[in-house]
Design a protein with these regions (language model features):
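Hydrophobic alpha-helical transmembrane segments in multi-pass integral membrane proteins
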Residues: 165-174, 229-245
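Hydrophobic alpha-helical membrane segments
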Residues: 196, 201, 223-238
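C-terminal membrane-solvent junction of multi-pass transporters and transport-like membrane proteins
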Residues: 149-150, 154, 209-230
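Membrane-embedded transport module
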Residues: 2-20, 35, 42-210
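Conserved Rossmann-like nucleotide-cofactor binding loop
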Residues: 27
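Basic, alpha-helical nucleic-acid-binding regions used in initiation and control of genome expression
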Residues: 32
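Extracellular/periplasmic helix-loop-helix junctions in multi-pass membrane proteins
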Residues: 179-182, 240-255
Length: 255
Protein backbone atom coordinates (compact mmCIF):
# COMPACT_ATOMS: atom_id res chain seq x y z
CA UNK A 1 0.00 0.00 0.00
CA UNK A 2 1.18 3.58 -0.66
CA UNK A 3 0.83 4.43 3.03
CA UNK A 4 3.26 1.64 3.97
CA UNK A 5 6.06 3.26 1.97
CA UNK A 6 5.29 6.62 3.53
CA UNK A 7 5.34 5.12 7.04
CA UNK A 8 8.75 3.55 6.37
CA UNK A 9 10.07 6.93 5.22
CA UNK A 10 8.70 8.69 8.31
CA UNK A 11 10.13 6.06 10.68
CA UNK A 12 13.59 6.32 9.14
CA UNK A 13 13.47 10.11 9.36
CA UNK A 14 12.52 9.95 13.05
CA UNK A 15 15.68 7.90 13.62
CA UNK A 16 17.78 10.67 12.06
CA UNK A 17 18.30 9.02 8.68
CA UNK A 18 18.47 10.93 5.41
CA UNK A 19 15.97 9.17 3.19
CA UNK A 20 15.86 9.02 -0.60
CA UNK A 21 13.02 7.25 -2.40
CA UNK A 22 12.73 6.17 -6.02
CA UNK A 23 9.45 5.45 -7.74
CA UNK A 24 7.61 5.60 -11.02
CA UNK A 25 3.97 5.06 -10.19
CA UNK A 26 1.13 7.10 -8.76
CA UNK A 27 1.17 4.98 -5.60
CA UNK A 28 4.76 6.10 -4.94
CA UNK A 29 3.81 9.79 -4.78
CA UNK A 30 3.26 10.03 -0.97
CA UNK A 31 6.64 8.45 -0.21
CA UNK A 32 8.37 10.57 -2.86
CA UNK A 33 6.83 13.72 -1.40
CA UNK A 34 7.78 12.99 2.23
CA UNK A 35 11.34 11.78 1.57
CA UNK A 36 14.29 14.14 1.86
CA UNK A 37 15.03 13.42 -1.79
CA UNK A 38 12.40 12.02 -4.12
CA UNK A 39 13.67 10.46 -7.34
CA UNK A 40 11.19 9.62 -10.07
CA UNK A 41 11.94 7.75 -13.27
CA UNK A 42 11.72 9.40 -16.64
CA UNK A 43 9.27 6.74 -17.77
CA UNK A 44 7.10 7.22 -14.67
CA UNK A 45 3.74 8.88 -14.31
CA UNK A 46 3.29 12.64 -14.16
CA UNK A 47 1.99 12.33 -10.60
CA UNK A 48 5.25 10.69 -9.48
CA UNK A 49 7.32 13.30 -11.31
CA UNK A 50 5.42 16.19 -9.71
CA UNK A 51 5.86 14.68 -6.24
CA UNK A 52 9.60 14.11 -6.65
CA UNK A 53 12.53 16.48 -6.33
CA UNK A 54 14.31 15.26 -9.45
CA UNK A 55 13.70 12.93 -12.36
CA UNK A 56 16.09 10.32 -13.75
CA UNK A 57 15.69 10.94 -17.45
CA UNK A 58 17.65 7.82 -18.42
CA UNK A 59 15.95 5.60 -15.79
CA UNK A 60 19.44 4.55 -14.67
CA UNK A 61 20.15 3.96 -10.99
CA UNK A 62 23.85 4.52 -11.68
CA UNK A 63 22.95 8.20 -12.01
CA UNK A 64 21.98 8.14 -8.32
CA UNK A 65 25.38 6.71 -7.42
CA UNK A 66 27.08 9.44 -9.46
CA UNK A 67 24.99 12.12 -7.75
CA UNK A 68 25.92 10.80 -4.29
CA UNK A 69 29.59 10.66 -5.30
CA UNK A 70 29.52 14.24 -6.54
CA UNK A 71 27.68 15.41 -3.43
CA UNK A 72 30.16 13.80 -1.05
CA UNK A 73 33.12 15.05 -3.06
CA UNK A 74 31.73 18.58 -3.11
CA UNK A 75 31.25 18.46 0.66
CA UNK A 76 34.87 17.38 1.07
CA UNK A 77 36.04 20.16 -1.26
CA UNK A 78 34.18 22.69 0.87
CA UNK A 79 35.96 21.30 3.94
CA UNK A 80 39.27 21.69 2.13
CA UNK A 81 38.48 25.29 1.25
CA UNK A 82 37.54 26.08 4.86
CA UNK A 83 40.75 24.43 6.07
CA UNK A 84 42.84 26.50 3.65
CA UNK A 85 41.15 29.77 4.59
CA UNK A 86 41.32 29.28 8.34
CA UNK A 87 45.00 28.30 8.25
CA UNK A 88 45.79 31.57 6.46
CA UNK A 89 43.64 33.58 8.87
CA UNK A 90 45.11 31.93 11.97
CA UNK A 91 48.66 32.53 10.73
CA UNK A 92 48.03 36.17 9.78
CA UNK A 93 46.23 36.95 13.05
CA UNK A 94 48.98 35.46 15.19
CA UNK A 95 51.63 37.29 13.16
CA UNK A 96 49.96 40.65 13.74
CA UNK A 97 49.71 39.93 17.48
CA UNK A 98 53.26 38.58 17.64
CA UNK A 99 54.67 41.49 15.67
CA UNK A 100 53.07 44.01 18.02
CA UNK A 101 54.58 42.20 21.02
CA UNK A 102 58.15 42.54 19.78
CA UNK A 103 57.56 46.13 18.72
CA UNK A 104 57.92 45.77 14.97
CA UNK A 105 55.87 47.50 12.31
CA UNK A 106 53.07 45.64 10.61
CA UNK A 107 54.74 42.62 8.98
CA UNK A 108 52.14 42.63 6.20
CA UNK A 109 50.65 45.75 4.64
CA UNK A 110 47.04 46.24 3.61
CA UNK A 111 47.82 45.81 -0.09
CA UNK A 112 49.81 42.66 0.64
CA UNK A 113 46.86 41.24 2.60
CA UNK A 114 44.58 42.11 -0.32
CA UNK A 115 46.75 39.89 -2.51
CA UNK A 116 46.66 37.15 0.13
CA UNK A 117 42.86 37.48 0.34
CA UNK A 118 42.64 37.21 -3.43
CA UNK A 119 44.57 33.94 -3.16
CA UNK A 120 42.29 32.73 -0.35
CA UNK A 121 38.89 33.76 -1.67
CA UNK A 122 39.23 33.45 -5.43
CA UNK A 123 42.15 31.30 -6.49
CA UNK A 124 41.78 28.73 -3.71
CA UNK A 125 38.06 28.41 -4.41
CA UNK A 126 38.79 27.86 -8.11
CA UNK A 127 41.49 25.29 -7.39
CA UNK A 128 39.69 23.25 -4.74
CA UNK A 129 36.23 23.42 -6.30
CA UNK A 130 37.60 22.09 -9.59
CA UNK A 131 38.99 18.91 -8.02
CA UNK A 132 37.29 15.88 -9.63
CA UNK A 133 35.09 13.53 -7.56
CA UNK A 134 36.90 10.68 -5.84
CA UNK A 135 35.67 7.10 -5.85
CA UNK A 136 36.92 6.51 -2.29
CA UNK A 137 34.21 8.76 -0.83
CA UNK A 138 31.67 6.03 -1.58
CA UNK A 139 33.37 3.80 1.01
CA UNK A 140 32.70 6.27 3.80
CA UNK A 141 29.77 5.99 6.18
CA UNK A 142 26.96 8.50 5.68
CA UNK A 143 27.27 11.62 7.79
CA UNK A 144 24.78 12.54 10.46
CA UNK A 145 22.69 15.63 9.83
CA UNK A 146 24.00 17.10 13.08
CA UNK A 147 27.68 16.74 12.11
CA UNK A 148 29.53 20.06 11.95
CA UNK A 149 31.42 20.66 8.73
CA UNK A 150 34.63 21.32 10.69
CA UNK A 151 35.15 17.97 12.38
CA UNK A 152 37.77 17.17 15.02
CA UNK A 153 40.35 16.05 12.45
CA UNK A 154 40.05 19.27 10.46
CA UNK A 155 40.13 21.43 13.61
CA UNK A 156 43.36 19.76 14.75
CA UNK A 157 44.85 20.14 11.27
CA UNK A 158 43.99 23.86 11.21
CA UNK A 159 45.55 24.39 14.63
CA UNK A 160 48.72 22.40 13.96
CA UNK A 161 49.43 23.78 10.48
CA UNK A 162 48.54 27.32 11.53
CA UNK A 163 50.89 27.16 14.52
CA UNK A 164 53.69 25.67 12.43
CA UNK A 165 53.36 28.43 9.84
CA UNK A 166 53.20 31.06 12.58
CA UNK A 167 56.26 29.63 14.34
CA UNK A 168 58.28 29.75 11.14
CA UNK A 169 57.19 33.25 10.17
CA UNK A 170 57.50 34.67 13.68
CA UNK A 171 60.99 33.22 14.03
CA UNK A 172 61.94 34.85 10.74
CA UNK A 173 60.41 38.15 11.83
CA UNK A 174 62.23 38.04 15.17
CA UNK A 175 65.51 37.32 13.40
CA UNK A 176 65.04 40.28 11.07
CA UNK A 177 64.05 42.57 13.94
CA UNK A 178 66.71 41.61 16.48
CA UNK A 179 69.65 40.34 14.40
CA UNK A 180 69.66 41.28 10.73
CA UNK A 181 67.65 44.47 10.89
CA UNK A 182 64.39 45.10 9.08
CA UNK A 183 65.02 46.47 5.60
CA UNK A 184 62.92 46.55 2.44
CA UNK A 185 64.63 43.38 1.22
CA UNK A 186 63.89 41.50 4.46
CA UNK A 187 60.23 42.55 4.41
CA UNK A 188 59.95 41.45 0.78
CA UNK A 189 61.47 38.07 1.64
CA UNK A 190 59.08 37.79 4.60
CA UNK A 191 56.06 38.56 2.42
CA UNK A 192 57.17 36.13 -0.31
CA UNK A 193 57.75 33.28 2.15
CA UNK A 194 54.32 33.90 3.66
CA UNK A 195 52.67 33.65 0.24
CA UNK A 196 54.69 30.55 -0.67
CA UNK A 197 53.56 28.85 2.53
CA UNK A 198 49.96 29.42 1.49
CA UNK A 199 50.85 28.19 -2.00
CA UNK A 200 52.16 24.98 -0.45
CA UNK A 201 49.11 24.81 1.80
CA UNK A 202 47.00 24.21 -1.29
CA UNK A 203 48.67 20.80 -1.48
CA UNK A 204 47.81 20.18 2.18
CA UNK A 205 44.21 21.11 1.46
CA UNK A 206 44.07 18.85 -1.59
CA UNK A 207 45.15 15.81 0.43
CA UNK A 208 42.88 16.62 3.41
CA UNK A 209 40.56 13.72 4.19
CA UNK A 210 42.14 11.51 1.54
CA UNK A 211 44.50 8.58 1.87
CA UNK A 212 46.17 9.53 -1.39
CA UNK A 213 49.12 11.84 -1.85
CA UNK A 214 48.50 15.41 -2.93
CA UNK A 215 50.49 14.59 -6.06
CA UNK A 216 48.19 11.71 -7.08
CA UNK A 217 47.05 12.48 -10.65
CA UNK A 218 48.57 15.92 -10.11
CA UNK A 219 49.03 16.72 -13.79
CA UNK A 220 45.39 15.90 -14.53
CA UNK A 221 44.13 18.56 -12.10
CA UNK A 222 44.33 21.37 -14.63
CA UNK A 223 42.38 23.83 -12.51
CA UNK A 224 44.80 23.41 -9.61
CA UNK A 225 47.82 23.64 -11.91
CA UNK A 226 46.48 26.86 -13.43
CA UNK A 227 45.91 28.45 -10.03
CA UNK A 228 49.35 27.42 -8.76
CA UNK A 229 50.93 29.02 -11.82
CA UNK A 230 48.86 32.21 -11.45
CA UNK A 231 49.94 32.59 -7.81
CA UNK A 232 53.62 32.13 -8.68
CA UNK A 233 53.41 34.54 -11.61
CA UNK A 234 51.45 37.10 -9.59
CA UNK A 235 53.89 36.98 -6.69
CA UNK A 236 56.84 37.43 -9.04
CA UNK A 237 55.20 40.47 -10.65
CA UNK A 238 54.39 42.00 -7.26
CA UNK A 239 57.96 41.54 -6.03
CA UNK A 240 59.50 42.92 -9.21
CA UNK A 241 57.04 45.70 -9.99
CA UNK A 242 55.03 46.26 -6.80
CA UNK A 243 57.26 49.00 -5.43
CA UNK A 244 55.81 51.32 -2.80
CA UNK A 245 52.28 50.11 -3.42
CA UNK A 246 53.14 46.63 -2.11
CA UNK A 247 56.23 47.64 -0.10
CA UNK A 248 58.44 45.31 -2.12
CA UNK A 249 61.78 45.56 -3.87
CA UNK A 250 63.22 43.27 -6.57
CA UNK A 251 65.15 40.33 -5.14
CA UNK A 252 68.16 38.51 -6.49
CA UNK A 253 69.85 35.26 -5.47
CA UNK A 254 72.28 37.03 -3.15
CA UNK A 255 69.40 38.66 -1.28
Amino acid sequence: RPTDKQRIVNMLQKHGEVVAVTGDGTNDAPALNHAHVGLSLGSGTSVAKNASDMTLIDDSFSSIVKAVQWGRSLYRNIQRFIFFQLVVNVTALLLVLGGSMIGTELPLTITQMLWVNLIMDTFAAMALASLPPESEVMKEKPRKQTDFIINRHIAWAIGIVGLLFFGLMFGLLYYFERVAGVSAEELTVFFTIFVMLQWWNLFNAKSLGSRRSAFHKFLSDRGLLFVLFIILAGQWLIVELGGKMFRTVPLDIET
